[in-house]
Curated annotation (Swiss-Prot):
Phylogenetic lineage: Eukaryota, Metazoa, Ecdysozoa, Arthropoda, Chelicerata
Keywords: Antimicrobial, Cleavage on pair of basic residues, Hypotensive agent, Secreted, Signal
A cellular component term, taken from the record's GO annotations: extracellular region
Subcellular location: Secreted
Signal peptide location: 1-22
Example GO BP: regulation of blood pressure
Reported function: Antimicrobial peptide. May also inhibit angiotensin-converting enzyme (ACE) and potentiate bradykinin (BK).
Prosequence residues removed at maturation: 74-77
Protein name as annotated: Bradykinin-potentiating peptide
Length: 77
């Protein structure tokens, strides 16, 4: 879209938002914060943060490297 079209859409959106007096942004944010999806995302974020903190604060000892397998024994005929 060109700039004029975007400007018209922006102005119309502002006019509509100005006319809707019952819409309160704070109430909208509150509803979003209490939604089930937001709760799931916050829980997942907390879990990931805890896992990261545990990994950073107490790094696990590196497991000893596996002993490389030698060349397989050849069968005698």
């Amino acid at each position: 879209m060109n700039k004029k079209t975007l400007l018209v859409i922006f102005i119309v959106t502002l006019l509509i938002a100005d006319e809707v007096n019952s819409f309160k942004f704070g109430g909208f944010l509150k509803k979003m914060w209490k939604s089930k999806l937001a709760k799931k995302l916050r829980a997942k974020g907390k879990q990931m943060l805890k896992e990261y903190a545990n990994k950073v604060l107490s790094p696990e000892e590196e497991a000893p490297a596996a002993v490389p397998a030698g060349a397989p024994e050849r069968r005698r005929r």
